[in-house]
């Protein structure tokens, strides 16, 4: 049985687990003796997937086949329809189980391509040098930011994609074995996990030319599905933002010391010094740690830090920045509330609780025992009470200090919240409500994925350090590289800037980070973590020259 269109041909074996061959429109073979696998995971045994390893070819129609997958007990069953379509080979799977389902996955092995390109973690490429018996997993949309991946050859290849506008969590796995790559697509049930049936749909298609061909196809669908507008038109209300090509990031208070990284007076000195090196009107001044005792302390309180000089000095800083021609962006968190905040008892009921009934929040290992201590809670951003509070907090900051832009940290998060409004819908609605309430304030986010692309026109690139062994600290894997797929896909709709944790040029990892930003076309940032760190270095001059060339 052969299923095909102009771009791809898929030859099925009588043994329904096997796909004899997948070849492209030009005859290039990209899979030989590929094995299909289907698995089901249930909440109470999430680490023990049920393997549906028995199949029967139940029905053959014109350009369509139906396969039943079952486990040993025959209690778990997946009905899969595979059919030819204009946009590839469509897979539609319906899974039933004797108890509620958490996650279903489909896998295909023995894929013969040179590399996989994934719009994840800022954009990644995995080459065929990836070690055998290794698998990397990417959750959509937090890590896997757009619902496709590309198996690339010298000219053409195949790609897997889905076209789901709903805010549903998905999973991509890329594995490498002696017989080639393995590709897995997973789909997660929406919380609360009560249903014993779960359905998913995805496509595999071929393409000719380079990797931009499938990206352009997905972008066209994405633009229509999410009603996207190009970034230049979206920035018409903030004309100053169109001129920005550099971020000057000056850190203030720190949690572990009464001595700040910069006082507000020292920040003013930085502004005067920077003016001699780059045009203020092209510089966005970004201020992490301007509030309280440092970044994320007492959130969502954002009173200017007394350690840095207090409210009066902060007003002087912002006024000086404006007088010199700069624009100012403050740092906030889009959903965080510390557990010791006076309002937390009221908001505790709105804390994110995932599908496994675990309360969610940010945590850090403070004592080296590999167990993270709780720091602050994640509040579902779709809750009206949270939106009302954040509008009040941000409104007071904007009115008191004439702030130009607000950075919303952690906008890329995605949870399967069992209690309250859908998390992704809520995040998007929350950002849109903030923008509507403060139409003259630019809102920026951390990272980018399909569900927050429309409301955010500025975003920090996120995750590029993951291509190195331990967050960029121990050297880079040659088989895992940064790739411009994400900036190429999203760059028409959002302006990407460097991440807030970019290192100072004196740090060993800076060279890797800046080279990655240059490859991806990301606006550079000079991040100053101490008032003694120099500005006038050769590396900074190179960053400025790169900034001038960015359109």
What label would you give each PLM region?
Residues 283-291, 389-419:
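Active-site groove signature of glycoside hydrolases
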Residues 211, 257, 292-297, 335-340, ...:
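Flexible loop/turn segments at secondary-structure boundaries
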Residues 313-314, 319, 330, 334-401, ...:
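Active-site-adjacent "subsite" loops/lids of carbohydrate-active enzymes
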Residues 250-356, 388-389, 427:
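Aromatic- and glycine-enriched glycan-recognition loops and surfaces
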Residues 246-248, 283-287, 328-331, 406-408, ...:
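Hydrophobic faces of well-ordered beta-strands that scaffold small-molecule active sites
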Residues 248, 297, 303, 398, ...:
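Conserved N-terminal glycine/acidic-rich loop preference
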Residues 2-284, 308, 320, 327:
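Carbohydrate-recognition beta-sandwich/jelly-roll modules
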Residues 195, 199-201, 423-551:
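Active-site-proximal substrate-binding groove within the catalytic cores of carbohydrate-active enzymes
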């Amino acid at each position: 049985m052969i299923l095909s269109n102009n771009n791809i041909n898929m030859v099925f074996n009588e043994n329904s687990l096997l796909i004899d061959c997948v070849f492209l429109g030009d005859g290039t073979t990209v899979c030989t003796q590929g094995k299909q696998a289907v698995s089901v995971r249930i909440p109470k045994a999430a680490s023990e997937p049920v393997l549906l390893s028995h199949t029967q070819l139940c029905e053959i129609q014109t350009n369509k086949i139906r396969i039943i997958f079952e486990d040993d007990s025959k209690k778990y069953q997946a009905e899969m329809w595979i059919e030819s379509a204009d946009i590839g080979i469509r897979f539609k799977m319906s899974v039933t189980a004797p108890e509620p389902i958490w996650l279903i996955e489909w896998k295909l092995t023995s894929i013969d391509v040179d590399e996989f390109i994934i719009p994840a973690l800022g954009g990644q490429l995995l080459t065929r040098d990836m070690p055998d018996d290794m698998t990397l997993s990417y959750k959509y949309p937090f890590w896997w930011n757009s619902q496709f991946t590309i198996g690339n050859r010298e000219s053409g290849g195949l790609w897997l994609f889905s076209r789901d506008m709903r805010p549903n969590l998905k999973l991509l796995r890329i594995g490498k074995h002696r017989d080639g790559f393995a590709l897995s697509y997973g789909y997660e049930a929406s919380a609360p996990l009560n249903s014993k049936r779960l359905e998913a749909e995805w496509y595999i298609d071929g393409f000719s030319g380079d990797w931009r061909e499938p990206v352009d196809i997905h972008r066209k669908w994405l633009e229509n599905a999410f009603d996207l507008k190009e970034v230049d038109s979206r920035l018409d209300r903030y004309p100053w933002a169109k001129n920005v090509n550099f971020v000057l990031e000056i850190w203030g208070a720190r949690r572990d010391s009464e001595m700040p990284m910069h006082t507000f007076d020292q920040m003013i000195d930085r502004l005067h010094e920077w003016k001699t090196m780059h045009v203020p009107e092209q510089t966005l001044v970004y201020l992490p740690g301007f509030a309280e005792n440092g970044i994320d302390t007492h959130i969502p309180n954002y009173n200017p830090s007394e350690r840095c000089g207090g409210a009066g000095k902060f007003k002087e800083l912002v006024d000086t920045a404006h007088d010199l021609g700069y624009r100012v962006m403050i740092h906030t968190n889009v959903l965080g509330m510390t557990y010791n905040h006076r309002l937390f008892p009221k908001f505790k009921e709105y804390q994110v609780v995932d599908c496994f009934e675990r309360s969610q929040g940010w945590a850090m290992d403070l004592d080296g025992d590999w167990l993270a201590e709780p720091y602050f809670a994640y509040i579902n951003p779709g809750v009206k009470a949270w939106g009302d509070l954040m509008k009040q907090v941000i409104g007071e900051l904007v009115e008191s200090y004439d702030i130009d832009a607000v950075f919303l940290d952690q906008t890329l998060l995605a949870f399967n919240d069992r209690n309250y409004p859908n998390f992704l819908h809520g995040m998007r609605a929350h950002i849109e409500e903030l923008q509507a309430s403060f139409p003259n304030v630019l809102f920026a986010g951390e990272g980018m994925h399909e569900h927050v692309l429309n409301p955010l026109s500025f975003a920090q690139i996120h995750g590029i350090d993951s291509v190195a062994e331990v967050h960029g600290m121990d050297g880079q894997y040659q088989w895992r590289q940064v790739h411009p797929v994400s900036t190429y896909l999203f760059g028409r709709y959002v302006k990407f800037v460097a991440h807030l944790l970019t290192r100072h040029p004196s740090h060993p990892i800076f060279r890797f980070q800046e080279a990655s930003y240059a490859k991806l076309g990301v606006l550079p940032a000079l991040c100053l973590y101490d008032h003694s760190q120099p500005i006038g270095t050769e590396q900074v001059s190179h960053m400025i020259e790169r900034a001038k060339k960015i359109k």
